[in-house]
């Protein structure tokens, strides 16, 4: 009653005894993963996470074009709306459609009315040229938002995982990132990530 007295012009809804809660926040997702729902992996079942990457996720992200990126984002955003999630961090990858890919996703987020933090996941798995393209896409999008801020969009700098990133590429990302930029990265998703990190640096992934 105190709220209705304080805001007499605001429309009141009968929640019928249910709770009203703030919107949920998804701190990590891959919109393009919408295409993986119900998808079976050809051949024998993957024995571990690296095989899941090689047999499912990497063939999937290599198949994406601008239209597929747009529709996978829209499907994921509709799903978020239905489940009360209002803010999402999307970790995007489309090795054969890198340039401008974050703009396609940003347009979908804008149309949805939700909030999004977007980045492109840089990786060495597709070669140096595409790693550099991923770096450039992150920087371009961050500069776009800096020059023309959006009330519901933000950017961060995406990295796949330390096991698919060389020290040289990591240094290039750090050098390219605008001052104050945060990084979004997979960490310790499987033992192989830990072993790779220890062999490269004698430190675990999060050390």
What is the meaning of each model-derived region?
Residues 2, 72-76, 137, 204:
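Well-ordered alpha-helical segments embedded in enzymatic catalytic cores
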Residues 28, 84, 186:
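Residue-level signal for inorganic ion chemistry
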Residues 18-40:
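Di-metal (Zn2+ and/or Mg2+/Mn2+) metal-binding site signature of metallo-dependent hydrolases
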Residues 1-21:
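Histidine-rich, glycine-flanked metal-binding segment
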């Amino acid at each position: 009653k105190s709220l209705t007295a304080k805001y007499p012009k605001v429309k009141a809804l009968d929640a019928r005894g249910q709770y009203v809660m703030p919107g949920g926040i998804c701190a990590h997702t891959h919109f393009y993963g919408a295409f993986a729902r119900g998808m079976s992996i050809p051949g024998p079942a993957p024995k571990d996470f690296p095989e899941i990457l090689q047999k499912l996720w990497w063939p999937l992200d290599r198949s994406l074009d601008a239209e597929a990126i747009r529709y996978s984002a829209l499907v994921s955003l509709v799903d978020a709306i239905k489940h009360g999630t209002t803010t999402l961090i999307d970790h995007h990858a489309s090795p054969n459609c890198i340039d401008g890919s974050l703009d396609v996703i940003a347009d979908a987020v804008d149309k949805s009315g939700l909030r999004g933090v977007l980045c492109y996941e840089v990786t060495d798995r597709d070669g140096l040229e595409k790693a550099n393209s991923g770096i450039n896409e992150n920087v371009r999008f961050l500069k776009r938002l800096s020059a023309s801020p959006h009330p519901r969009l933000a950017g961060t700098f995406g990295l796949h995982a330390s096991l698919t990133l060389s020290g040289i590429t990591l240094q290039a990302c750090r050098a390219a990132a605008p001052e104050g930029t945060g990084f979004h990265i997979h960490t310790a998703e499987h033992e192989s990530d830990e072993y790779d990190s220890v062999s490269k640096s004698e430190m675990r992934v999060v050390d």
